[in-house]
């Protein structure tokens, strides 16, 4: 590749904090999700996509494009046709745990509201967490910090 090569990306303009972040190393076209179409990907010569779950990455979007990498700013990936991507050499990446702290904060808010309503301090409660993955691990840390058993 030439030394002045810059990858070309198409990004969903609704991705928070992304605008300008990659401009030093790549050429990014920011589009509303509904404008991320096959025709636009071809026109922009996009090699990569930065998307949310509203963009369905399947044959009808990707066929005939230069896209070789897809990154979704979501934990889920059911909007990406993994079989199509695999058979066409397109790498894809999701963002597991990307909203785990926010969900854990919400859970703790619900627990705090319950404690206020019942007039019982959280430190007197015992919490059972089913699964200590991204969200459960964050809930455990926050609950322990507040004295919950």
Regions found by a protein language model. Give the residues of each.
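N-terminal glycine-/charge-rich "phosphate-binding" loop or analogous flexible N-terminal tail
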Residues: 1-46, 135, 139, 147
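Charged active-site motifs of nucleotide-sugar-dependent glycosyltransferases
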Residues: 7-8, 91, 126
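Short, structured coil segments at secondary-structure junctions
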Residues: 24-26, 65-66, 88, 146
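Residues at the C-terminal ends
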Residues: 43, 85-87, 145
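Phosphate/diphosphate ligand-binding glycine-rich loop within oxidoreductases
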Residues: 47-120
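Rossmann-like dinucleotide/phosphate-binding beta-alpha-beta segment
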Residues: 119-149
């Amino acid at each position: 590749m030439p030394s002045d090569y810059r990858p070309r990306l198409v990004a969903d303009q609704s991705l928070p904090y992304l605008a300008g972040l990659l401009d030093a190393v790549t050429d990014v076209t920011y589009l509303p999700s509904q404008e991320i179409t096959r025709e636009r990907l071809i026109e922009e010569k996009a090699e990569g996509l930065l998307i949310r779950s509203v963009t369905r990455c399947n044959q009808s979007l990707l066929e005939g494009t230069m896209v070789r990498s897809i990154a979704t700013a979501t934990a889920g990936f059911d909007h990406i046709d993994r079989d199509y991507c695999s058979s066409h050499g397109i790498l894809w990446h999701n963002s597991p745990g990307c909203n785990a702290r926010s969900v854990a904060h919400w859970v703790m808010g619900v627990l705090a509201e319950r404690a206020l309503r019942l007039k019982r301090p959280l430190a007197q409660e015992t919490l059972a967490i089913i699964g200590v993955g991204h969200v459960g691990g964050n809930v455990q840390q926050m609950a322990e910090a507040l004295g919950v058993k």
